[in-house]
Amino acid sequence: MNTTFQQFAEAHSLRNGYKLAQTLSPVPPADDPQRLMAVWRSTNSHSVKGDIKHFIKSSTAHKRKLDHDETTGWVEVYTSYWKAVSEILAGESGKSSWTKVYEAWKELTSVLIRGYNSHGFEAWTIPSLYMVGKYLRLFAIKSDEERRAKAFDTGPGASLISDDFDPETDKQLQLRDCEGHLKRIFSLCLNDRAPLEESRKWGIYFVINLLFKTYFKLNSASLSRTILKTLAVYNDKGDMPPLEMFPKSQRVTFKFYEGVLLFLEENYIKAESHLNEAWQLCHKDAYPQSERILTYLIPCRLLTSHVLPTKALLENYPRLQDLFLPLATCIKTGNLQAFDQALQRGEAEFVKRRIYLTLERGRDIALRNLLRKVFIAGGFDEAKEADAAPVRRTRIPVAEFQAAISMGSGHLVDPDEVECMLANMIYKDLMKGYIARERGIVVLSKKGAFPGTGL
């Protein structure tokens, strides 16, 4: 454990919160894979608290000394950390469970929060909260997965488990419990009254992002609105550092989830703005993050400005190529049947990402492009004067649109259904004109018959 507390003392001497947080990691560093085992072997359950107090005092003796109250707080934290490490190592050897790991890590989280409330932990140490909060969520997910696996176990004792555990009701029990503890960290940061330069408010967006991830995992994305409303109150009072002053990685994640939340609320214009900001901030080599942003930004742009993704844009994203390029090709060519087939092929992934219904609206754009082709194929009206500029034919028989839609759909479409489709196009401002039913024609505008397409 000497290595851990040497790093602890150095972090305190430098006031380096991220270095301090590494001493609370449940994952050993790559250059010291036996770190957790060394921590566990350095003491035992009977003398752990006294040993840790000795380690902290001796390691900080020649550096920045801690006062008695703060020392007591960190002794409690590292005692809880040692117990959590014990469960992690026991789990690796099959002698513990993820549920016990989660409970031990939850205790560490509570003790660390108490350190800020009761033992005067300074704001520069907040990356420690990032570390425990991040892994609290991951251990909660692991625990829930373990419980579900046991619930469906058909081996001896399975019936005993199922008697008191409803897998549908309790399938995310630990993650819901975790959400409550993350909100405690959120409140701890939000309600700090210290001056901004030494405030825990600098940890707020990291914690908000953890809560966003938790709510989306719980399929309760709407709960994110409560967090955003609370944040807005503090921003309006000028009691919060500007978002631009936080690390770029935190801003990218925050803007992504804010954009997705607006996307799910069908506020596509605002969603596009937030997602585009996340896209612009995202590092060019952060492909997984960029891919997640594009998964929602592409459908947004399809609806707001009818812009289709290009092969060049998706060059580094094979999964997105498979999902979006077939749809983009069908929309561009107006091939309704192929569009329906491409949407059906990707249905499972589209539904999982909650973009199916949005992409389904892309069929209107495909239909618009098909109708536009009919308009172009109609050619020009005969010029009344020799030197007059050519004017496209604007009176199109409904029968011509019916033939095109039937061919594009792969089946005969009833004339009344065609008229309904045309009326819908006009209503959505994808086509300008009106239907003259008594004459069986569509009269299109001489200028801008298909807005945004150059015709």
UniProtKB/Swiss-Prot annotation:
* A GO molecular-function annotation: double-stranded DNA binding
Gene symbol?
CSN12
Family designation: Belongs to the CSN12 family.
Question: InterPro entries, per this entry?
Answer: Csn12-like, PCI_dom, WH-like_DNA-bd_sf
The identity of this protein, by name, is Protein CSN12 homolog
Q: Which domain of life is it from?
A: Eukaryota
Which residue range or ranges hold the PCI domain? 252-449
